[in-house]
């Protein structure tokens, strides 16, 4: 799960589950970064396989996805922060920090989603 932001009260978090499912039109080259085609109803941010996406910190090594990985603007959703924290406390959900996404990539991802017609306005306000 990739957390993209929180509402102004911190009660809801905006997140997306990165996927290896490729729904990019077959006539397009898949390149790293933003693909936004409003006339074809496509908004996706692509992480190419093997591309380092994290910054090194606190003993964590660099991280890259093994396969091309996608975050689709249409797949964003909000989740109650309190529920998520409760699940962690009660050991229902386990969090494994694999790294901190680089600021450059994270900002590009947020701009890609924020500028898309495919992303709901309520989500854009959080971004």
Range-by-range predicted roles:
Residues 3-127:
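Conserved functional hotspots at enzyme active or ligand-binding sites that engage polyanionic ligands
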């Amino acid at each position: 799960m990739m957390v993209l932001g929180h509402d102004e009260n911190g009660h809801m978090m905006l997140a997306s589950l990165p996927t290896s499912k490729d729904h990019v039109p077959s006539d397009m080259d898949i390149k790293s970064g933003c693909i936004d085609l409003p006339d074809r109803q496509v908004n996706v941010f692509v992480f190419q396989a093997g591309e380092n996406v994290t910054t090194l910190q606190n003993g964590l090594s660099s991280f890259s996805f093994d396969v091309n990985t996608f975050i689709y603007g249409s797949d964003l959703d909000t989740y109650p922060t309190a529920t998520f924290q409760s699940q962690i406390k009660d050991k229902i959900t386990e969090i494994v920090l694999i790294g901190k996404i680089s600021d450059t990539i994270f900002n590009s991802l947020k701009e890609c989603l924020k500028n898309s017609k495919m992303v709901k306005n309520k989500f854009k306000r959080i971004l």
